[in-house]
Swiss-Prot record:
HAMAP family documented for this protein: HSV_NEC1
Record's comment on post-translational modification: Phosphorylated at serine residues in the N-terminus. This phosphorylation regulates the localization within the inner nuclear membrane.
Pfam family, one: Herpes_UL31
Keyword Repeat: no
Zinc finger intervals, CCCH-type: 90-217
Assembly notes: Forms a heterohexameric complex with NEC2. Interacts with capsid vertex specific component 2/CVC2; this interaction directs the capsid to the host inner nuclear membrane to initiate budding.
Keywords: Host membrane, Host nucleus, Membrane, Metal-binding, Phosphoprotein, Zinc, Zinc-finger
Superkingdom in the source lineage: Viruses
Lineage: Viruses, Duplodnaviria, Heunggongvirae, Peploviricota, Herviviricetes
Family: Belongs to the herpesviridae NEC1 protein family.
Name this polypeptide is given: Nuclear egress protein 1
Function: Plays an essential role in virion nuclear egress, the first step of virion release from infected cell. Within the host nucleus, NEC1 interacts with the newly formed capsid through the vertexes and directs it to the inner nuclear membrane by associating with NEC2. Induces the budding of the capsid at the inner nuclear membrane as well as its envelopment into the perinuclear space.
Compartments where found: Host nucleus inner membrane
């Protein structure tokens, strides 16, 4: 192989002293008191890799001794499918870059503490979904988006079309589940937009969760809850203009398991929604958001 120089690995039998020294050096450097001595992170890493080069069989033993991971963040590109994140990954998006972090070692996760997540098992989500008719005002931001979507339609049949849209969106419990988990976590000023997902079917809607501000950090526990709540749905992190968002759309090649979710009477929800006095500023903000996202192409 041209251009490569292969270095022969040293024999363990010929140089056991190096192994012993590396082992002792590695363990000494992981003592709490070592942080104030002249050792540096580079010294620690060098001792570690010298040791495993001589005794790879002991690598697992040393990995178990690790307190802090060697790699704390991983750079990603958008759009990013959250199914590629592992259970302990948090998400950070800002003008400085897009990263997955290790939740237990993320300064933002540690400083903010665990999100105030209540019960988010499937039974609790189904109960909230069924009882939404009794909490219309609590979910007004979710429902206001449907009102604006209906208002964008033209013609005398607009009210009938809005009721039809509401019926179709309400019939997709996973969209409500995703919003409920975010609302339950305490994240404020989140908006949701609904668009037809032609690839998933003529009556299937997808949802964009649009976050406020110029930076976004999602705790790893929140991400885990959302993924668990939206099985058979893709959760994709993206950015459009200056807005960070999550796209919730069905995996159209997979069947959803919603047979355990009771149907919600959309007509009753619509009647209560018509009697609800929703803030005009909220409706205006939604109108601007829909106009801004009309040209957005959702990732496949």
């Amino acid at each position: 192989m041209t251009g490569h120089t292969l270095v022969r690995r040293k024999s363990i039998g010929r140089d056991k002293r190096l192994v012993g020294r590396s082992r002792r050096q590695w363990r000494d450097m992981n003592l709490p008191s070592y942080g104030n001595s002249k050792g540096t992170n580079m010294d620690i890493y060098r001792a570690y890799f010298e040791f495993i080069a001589e005794s790879p069989a002991d690598e697992l033993m040393l990995v178990k001794d690790l307190v802090t991971p060697l790699i704390k963040t991983t750079s990603i590109s958008l759009p990013f499918d959250m199914s590629e994140a592992v259970a302990d990954n948090c998400l950070s998006l800002s003008g400085m870059g897009y990263y997955l972090g290790v939740g237990g070692c993320c300064p933002t996760c540690v400083s903010s503490g665990d999100p105030r997540l209540g019960r988010n098992d499937r039974a609790a989500l189904i109960l909230a979904y069924v009882q939404q008719i009794n909490n219309i005002y609590h979910y007004r931001i979710f429902l206001a988006s449907i009102i604006v979507l209906g208002d964008r339609l033209r013609g005398d049949a607009r009210d009938k079309d809005m009721e039809s849209i509401l019926t179709r969106i309400i019939a997709i419990p996973e969209l409500f589940f995703a919003y409920y988990v975010l609302l339950d976590s305490g994240i404020k000023n989140v908006k949701v937009l609904f668009y037809l997902d032609r690839e998933a079917g003529s009556s299937e809607y997808m949802m964009y969760i649009v976050f406020p501000g110029k930076a976004l950090h999602l705790h790893y526990r929140l991400i885990d809850c959302m993924k668990s709540a939206c099985k058979s749905y893709r959760i994709i992190a993206h950015v459009w203009r200056t807005n960070f968002l999550l796209v919730i759309r069905k995996e159209y090649d997979r069947q959803t398991d919603s047979c355990d979710v009771p149907a919600v009477n959309a007509e009753d929800v619509y009647c209560k929604l018509c009697d609800l006095n929703i803030d005009g500023e909220l409706l205006l903000e939604y109108g601007k958001l829909y106009s801004a996202f009309d040209e957005f192409l959702p990732p496949r």
